[in-house]
Regions:
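Extracytoplasmic "Venus flytrap"
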Residues: 1-24, 28, 37-53, 57, ...
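Flexible loop/hinge segments that line or gate small-molecule binding clefts
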Residues: 68-106, 128, 225-234, 238, ...
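Loop/turn elements at helix/coil->beta-strand transitions in domains of secreted/extracellular proteins
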Residues: 4, 33-34, 57-62, 80-84, ...
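Hinge/cleft segment of the Venus flytrap/periplasmic-binding protein
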Residues: 2, 132, 139, 151, ...
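Hydrophobic alpha-helical
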Residues: 48, 52, 61-80, 84, ...
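Hydrophobic alpha-helical segments within soluble ligand-binding/sensing domains
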Residues: 99-127, 142-143, 172-176, 224-229, ...
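Immediate post-signal peptide segment of exported/extracytoplasmic ligand-binding proteins
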Residues: 1-6, 30, 119-126
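Short, solvent-exposed amphipathic alpha-helices that sit
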Residues: 17-34, 107-114, 139-159, 174, ...
Length: 300
């Protein structure tokens, strides 16, 4: 492996999820004795610029986020003969050396199964189920479809109301304002469940319901940002989140990159989500803190 070098183009470092994918990959690379250079991208334009750097420097493999919107970047890497390993979403349309991440549709079904348990525990179900989605991202689209399909299969009589939010509304602040306004026209008894397809929408919706005192609404989401785990510890509004495994994703990305440097393609490496509830959140946080502490020196 001497002389070989791998690039990791890291996107979304305002979220712990991506930070620890990067940190885990760096630690794994160090242990394997291979050079890993981390290039932080702030937006799509910056991401393309970082990919251009990877091509110019002629890295032996590149780890980059899986997004349909950056297909041209994958193609540029492919034309340069650089194997591509994606993390997060498993996108189609390119011959990837490996795709590492969660099945986002399944994450949505896992969240829906927790919502179903909640609904089945009620004496009477009142109101509709709201799904907060950001259609601009295939990751969130897949999660929303998984959630809505699963709810509809179990409760065909329930109204599942998909709310399509723009990118600015899918942040915690944006989603809080959006749900604040949404609830004005939906009095008590009009809504029983709200699902947020990413951390921002889940946290924003939880904050809006909490401030409005709408404790008849149960919140469900995906991801395990610190704010979501705090909401679970409170337990009044946020009932379950489906956590991804950034540490393992980083490890598997680096394992796939090492294989790619040696001429081997590992294909799809799927990692399951972990359901976290108010009852299990303390143990989850303890385990996560232990993993994150070990990665502190490697954070980008």
């Amino acid at each position: 492996m001497s002389g070989k070098k791998v690039a990791l183009v890291l996107f979304g470092t305002n979220f712990d999820y991506f930070v620890y994918i990067g940190a885990s990959a760096k630690k794994t690379a160090e242990e394997a004795g291979i050079q890993l250079d981390v290039l932080n991208a702030s937006d799509f334009v910056d991401l393309s610029e970082k990919v251009s750097q990877v091509v110019t420097i002629k890295y032996d493999a590149c780890i980059v986020i899986g997004l349909p919107a950056i297909m041209a970047d994958y193609q540029a890497l492919g034309e340069a003969g650089i194997p591509v390993i994606t993390y997060d979403s498993m996108v189609d349309g390119f011959d990837f050396s490996a795709r590492v991440g969660s099945d986002n549709y399944v994450l949505g079904t896992q969240a829906a199964e927790e919502a179903i348990k909640y609904l089945e525990s009620l004496d009477e179900i009142n109101g509709e189920v709201i799904c907060l989605n950001c259609p601009e991202g295939e990751t969130m689209n897949s999660r929303a479809r998984g959630f809505m399909d699963t709810i509809a299969a179990r409760f065909p009589e329930l109204t599942v109301n998909e709310q399509k939010l723009g990118a600015t509304d899918s942040t915690a602040e944006g989603a809080q304002t959006y749900v604040d306004n949404l609830l004005v026209g939906k009095p008590k008894g009009a809504v029983c469940v709200i699902f947020g397809a990413n951390a921002g929408m889940a946290m924003g919706a939880t904050a809006a319901c909490s401030i409005a005192g709408r404790d008849e609404i149960a919140l469900f989401g995906i991801d395990n940002e610190a704010g979501q785990l705090q909401d679970l510890e409170n337990g009044t509004y946020y009932k379950a989140t489906v956590a991804q495994q950034p540490v393992k994703i980083g490890q598997e990305c680096m394992r796939a990159a090492i294989a790619a440097v040696q001429g081997e393609s590992l294909g799809d490496i799927g990692l399951p989500g972990i359901v976290v509830t108010p009852e299990t959140v303390a143990d989850f946080i303890a385990q996560q803190d232990k993993e994150y502490e070990a990665l502190a020196p490697y954070k980008p």
